[in-house]
């Protein structure tokens, strides 16, 4: 357990930051799921709309260190490829 005032404050800050990050990750995952669901349904317009919303979120969180930059790139690449394939098939 923390003995100094500084250590106690750091524990409080760490917990607050953890909860903030959990909320942000949850929001990001929700957007990814919405995009994946639109692709699965075959709705090109909804998929493109959700994709344009999720890309800046992924970039922002990658730049802030919430997720790794390669993970953001991987999500964007895979979703983009699926949307492109869906658009050409439709």
Curated annotation (Swiss-Prot):
GO biological process: translation
One Pfam family from the record: Ribosomal_S20p
Keywords: Ribonucleoprotein, Ribosomal protein, RNA-binding, rRNA-binding
Top-level taxon: Bacteria
Annotated SUPFAM superfamilies: Ribosomal protein S20 (SSF46992)
GO molecular function, one term: small ribosomal subunit rRNA binding
GO CC terms: cytosol; small ribosomal subunit
Described function: Binds directly to 16S ribosomal RNA.
NCBIfam families: S20 (TIGR00029)
HAMAP family linked to this entry: Ribosomal_bS20 (MF_00500)
Family: Belongs to the bacterial ribosomal protein bS20 family.
PANTHER family for this protein: 30S RIBOSOMAL PROTEIN S20 (PTHR33398), SMALL RIBOSOMAL SUBUNIT PROTEIN BS20C (PTHR33398:SF1)
Protein name (database record): Small ribosomal subunit protein bS20
Gene name linked to the record: rpsT
């Amino acid at each position: 357990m923390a003995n100094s005032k500084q250590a106690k404050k750091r524990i409080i800050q760490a917990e607050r930051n953890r909860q903030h990050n959990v909320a942000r990750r949850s929001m990001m995952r929700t957007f990814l799921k919405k995009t994946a669901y639109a692709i699965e349904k075959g709705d090109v317009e909804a998929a493109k709309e959700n994709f344009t919303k999720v890309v800046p979120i992924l970039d922002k969180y990658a730049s802030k260190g919430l997720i790794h930059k390669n993970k953001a790139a991987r999500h964007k690449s895979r979703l983009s490829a699926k949307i492109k394939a869906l658009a050409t098939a439709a």
